[in-house]
Amino acid sequence: DTADSFMRWMLLGPYHPEVKQSVARIQRMHNSVARSFPESFSEEEDFIYSYAVFTLTSARMREVAGAPPRPQTELIAVHHFWRDISEQLHSTSGRPSTYPSTVEEMVSYADEIESREYPPTPDGRIVSNAMIDQFSDRYFRGRLKPLGRAMILAFVSDRVQHRQDVVRANPVLVYAVRKAFRAYFFLQDHVLPPTRRPFSVLLQSEEWKDMRKEWRTAEVSANPNRSGLNREPIKTGAEAGR
């Protein structure tokens, strides 16, 4: 539900009435689950690290692909966006007190967490591989499935892959993916014209609604036994290391 809401949050802004209502609903869901599993949403660090990942992913992808960075002002804007969201969506301990005040501090925050030594966990392996497989099953079915795994792991550090004990991707495909993204970023920056259809208009279109409906139907068909919040959350990353 949180991921499904991201686009509208970004388009409307963190203090738009619809966004505040949506964020409050997610916070209530977290609080409800926390009554049964209090450790799942109690750590401020887990939330701030997630916001750091959301902020830095695009810049890190460009760096790994060997593409020039986007203007720093874009990173600052994203950093401010998640800062404002973090005031509304946070751990059960309350609003964050350690949110990095600058992009540079956020980079250091993420690097420090990712440099810690956590032993691989069975749960981490299960969750990581399941997420990669879900992506591959949706976009790269059949013989193309290894390409889906390579597309994800091309931008995941060796340290994190080792920690989560994921099934490694074909190194040749990883190399090809990085080169393809470098070319894409070049085209995006220097060749392709800006889109003439605002993304906000696309999200309101029947075309987008039909696409989302098709995705959800495919997910249910692929996993008819999928359940909601009635199972114990699986711990990964920093949470699993504690």
Language model segments and positions:
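Mature, function-bearing regions of proteins
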Residues: D1-R242
